[in-house]
Amino acid sequence: MARILITSALPYINGIKHLGNLAGSMLPADVYARFKRAQGHETLYICATDEHGTPAELAAAAAGQDVATYCAEQHVLQHEVGRAFGLSWDHFGRSSSPQNHRLTQHFCQALEDHGLIEERVDQMVYSVDDKRFLPDRYVEGTCPHCKFEKARGDQCDNCGNLLDPTDLIDPYSVISGSRNIEVRDTKHLYLLQTKMQDKIRAWVDAHADWPPLARSIAYKHLDEGLIDRGITRDLAWGIPVAQDGVPRPGFEEKVFYVWFDAPIEYIAATQEWAEGSPDRDWKRWWRTDAGADDVRYVQFMGKDNVAFHTVSFPATILGSEEPWKSVDMLKAFNWLNWYGGKFSTSNKRGVFMDAALEILPPDLWRWYLTANSPEGSDTAFTWEQFASAVNRDLADVLGNFVNRILKFNESKFEGVVPAGGEPGPLEEKLFADVSARLADLAEQMDAIEIRKSAQALRALWVVGNEYLQEAAPWTAIKTDRDRAAVIVRTALNLAALYAKISAPFIPFAAEKIGDAFGLDFPASWPSNDAKAELNTLSVGRPITVPEVLFKKIEDEQIAEWTARFGGAE
């Protein structure tokens, strides 16, 4: 059985993440990790805060803190809110860790040993008024490709093209707003991606099973021709350009570029996870010469991160010529937008994870964000659509079914699994239907089709309601108690089954349902044999009735949240 390594794109340290960040990487990765664990696979889900680069320095300055203190505090906050959302990371690390310092410096040396690192005198944007170079996000201006007026110095958020600060039209300093900008010489290290063009293309070619979104972005950059990328920056905060603790001459005041060290943190975070635990070995997950051959590595990220993960990081891994495990499946997502525009951390636009939990339980958000996963195209959050998904799917379908059958059982069968009767034609039809739908759900989950998986899960919930409505135990109990017992026993088993298969999506509610049956959680994933799965509860087993699982969202609440967070604009 394959071991499953899962990473989700590292959330930036500059504040609590918004729902778009959650929907496009961390949440689907968690759903998949929970599913694979339930199937019995040895699964490792790794994530970390991305703590270097200009976003960290700018956010720390705005908060009036030194950057190290700011990052330490924000890491704790992001970890806490992620756990509150049910994100089941095996480890949530920090890209500023000593492990990542050592490993990033190691990769640079390995690449240089193979002729893929070159020192170049570069022309970089310099702010005369700020008396400093302006790397990456310290400078903004007009994108030369799409003319977006707030493009950053590393990437345009509008068209997605990777940029250098000198590419920008009419640049200005993010620090001061000054347009008193010059271009000056500065020395930097470059990763010679041009030498890796054929090797990276062959690597991408070998992954024909990647989703079209990931492949199309990868080939766009390959077809345009790879360029050599600067991997150092004129910044104070970051990983020093050094080897064995000795600064590289001429680079004493420079650090590695955040997009060089951030993906390496996937490996370094696994080292963090393993450190101090003799039973954990990071190498068996990452080194093919140390047992990682049976690992299936799946990455989750938004589409704006794909270029770095299909070009720059592979250039690092492949260029080192060391036996590192590379990604098998790259699952990319489009954007979850906020009504007609984008969520924005810097502009505080949209609902953020901490605020979301202030108003509603995590499962409601988890369900909406997976059922409306932005896989095939960008999707837009609206309060009305959110309320509809919660009320229709969770309250009316799953919650209604569980509540009805458990209360009926408590009323008519003393709250225990009833004995009596044998399954009839209606149950046989149900067994066949549920078996087929379980197979479909597992197939969609294995394919990492998040939205289709949610649809398949909801379809299984609907089957239970339809069965209960057609079987009508409230009518059967009046004339045939054994027949009513069969119906109730079958429906109770369905509810227990729902707890197991819903857990990757709505783990808190699933555990509440499981607790009503005395099930151990997390539970194993069921087989596709519904006849067997719907006969697992022993006769006489006590069943309790939980509190209402899902409260409906009312129009008054929508109005209140629209006033607080915004809406149609």
Swiss-Prot record:
Co-factor: note: Binds 1 zinc ion per subunit.
Residues in the signal sequence: none
Keyword Lipid metabolism (UniProt): no
Any GO molecular function: ATP binding
Subcellular compartments: Cytoplasm
Annotated keywords: Aminoacyl-tRNA synthetase, ATP-binding, Cytoplasm, Ligase, Metal-binding, Nucleotide-binding, Protein biosynthesis, Zinc
UniProt main location, coarse: cytoplasm
GO biological process: methionyl-tRNA aminoacylation
Binding of ATP, residues: T345
Motif window: 'HIGH' region: 11-21
Cofactor: Zn(2+)
UniProt key word Metal-binding: yes
Enzyme Commission numbers on file: 6.1.1.10
Motif ('KMSKS' region): 342-346
Annotated family: Belongs to the class-I aminoacyl-tRNA synthetase family. MetG type 1 subfamily.
Alphabetical list of HAMAP family matching this protein: Met_tRNA_synth_type1
Family annotation (NCBIfam families): metG
Protein task: Is required not only for elongation of protein synthesis but also for the initiation of all mRNA translation through initiator tRNA(fMet) aminoacylation.
Assembly, per entry: Monomer.
Name of the protein described by the UniProt record: Methionine--tRNA ligase
Species per Swiss-Prot/TrEMBL record: Caulobacter vibrioides (strain NA1000 / CB15N) (Caulobacter crescentus)
